[in-house]
Amino acid sequence: MAYNFVRSYIDTFRERTAAISHTSTFRETGQITPEEFVLAGDFLVFKFPSWQWGDASSAGKRVPYLPEGKQYLMTRGVPCHRRLDDNFAGEAGQDETIVGDGFAGSEGADDDGWLRTGGMAASQEAKVRDVRTVDESGNLGAAEEEDEIPDMEDMDDDEEAIIRDPQGGSSSTAPLRTYTLYICYSAHYRTPRLYLSGYGATSVPLKPQEMMEDIVGDYKDKTVTIEDFPFFEHALKTASVHPCKHASVMKVLLDRADAALKLRLAKLKAGKDIGKLDTGMEGLVDDTRLLKLSEQAKGKEGDEAKDDWEVLSEGGDDEVAIRVDQYLVVFLKFMASVTPGIEHDFTMGV
């Protein structure tokens, strides 16, 4: 506890005395400038209206390097139905596994993968594409080939597609909690920083130790600490994800997304069917490229809109998968690994 207090004091001092850089190093370091933070925030608010800009409660709480009225981003009422206890993922809930992104040659690079909590035995290798079916008796089916995956539009009336509650089984659903998420800019680390404020089913604010129940075990009191939200006069206790590793992780994600994009473009040139992926880095590329398409095709119809697909499909070798204004979309997907019980996608379905 004393250590966390000292670290919070040091962090506050660093934020107040940090030299502000206006030189973009987004691609090289994973860091962003205040101007890029505002650009990414405007994109997030535009694409996902549940997010909005907020202002400091008083002029004395504002930071000079961000515009008035755009001091931080916030979204309210994000649901959290489950606690991160042993019931979160059954017996496998105690395991944490690094999930690779599916690229060849990435074995052993655990530090660069995604942290997955539960769902796999310790002896299993995590493969994002190894998806199998489970029947009502709990028996694991054989792995499906890609060409056997059914079209979701054909499953509307398929009773076999209905997920049924196991009879007599215990539910992992806990009393509903909701969270207000805040994204601020860290001047010292030059990255976004996430703050979470939780509320119980009756809208009573959660105590700090209760909010920690929704944080992945290894992050508690290490990467995630209880902090006062910096833009309010009154003390609002929040769980905050420390940004010391954000830039390096974001750099890895950006590089891997670029590699996934190059892989997809190579497949297109070779005439291969790439389909639509929902997981891994190629799935993330799909999501961000859909965002690009919706921007370019907005207000266009017919052949003109069709041309946008061709432009996206025939991008040059120097095309990047994720632009700087899409930074916060990727950042929130990264933050979801710290709080998997909080439904971040509730705020930003692509």
UniProtKB/Swiss-Prot annotation:
Residues 126-135 have a biased composition (Basic and acidic residues). One of its GO terms (biological process) is autophagosome assembly. One of its GO terms (molecular function) is Atg8-family conjugating enzyme activity. The active site is at C244. Residues 126-153 are annotated as: Disordered. Pfam families: Autophagy_act_C. Residues 248-326 are annotated as: Handle region. The keyword Transport applies. Residues 87-165 are annotated as: Flexible region. Keywords: Autophagy, Cytoplasm, Protein transport, Transport, Ubl conjugation pathway. Residues 143-153 have a biased composition (Acidic residues). InterPro entries: Atg3/Atg10. It is found in: Cytoplasm. GO terms for cellular component: cytosol; mitochondrion; phagophore; phagophore assembly site. The N-terminal region is involved in phosphatidylethanolamine-binding and is required for ATG8-PE conjugation. Monomer. Interacts with ATG8 through an intermediate thioester bond through the C-terminal Gly of ATG8. Also interacts with the 40 amino acid C-terminal region of the E1-like ATG7 enzyme. Also interacts with the ATG12-ATG5 conjugate. Belongs to the ATG3 family. E2 conjugating enzyme required for the cytoplasm to vacuole transport (Cvt) and autophagy. Required for selective autophagic degradation of the nucleus (nucleophagy) as well as for mitophagy which contributes to regulate mitochondrial quantity and quality by eliminating the mitochondria to a basal level to fulfill cellular energy requirements and preventing excess ROS production. Responsible for the E2-like covalent binding of phosphatidylethanolamine to the C-terminal Gly of ATG8. This is Autophagy-related protein 3.
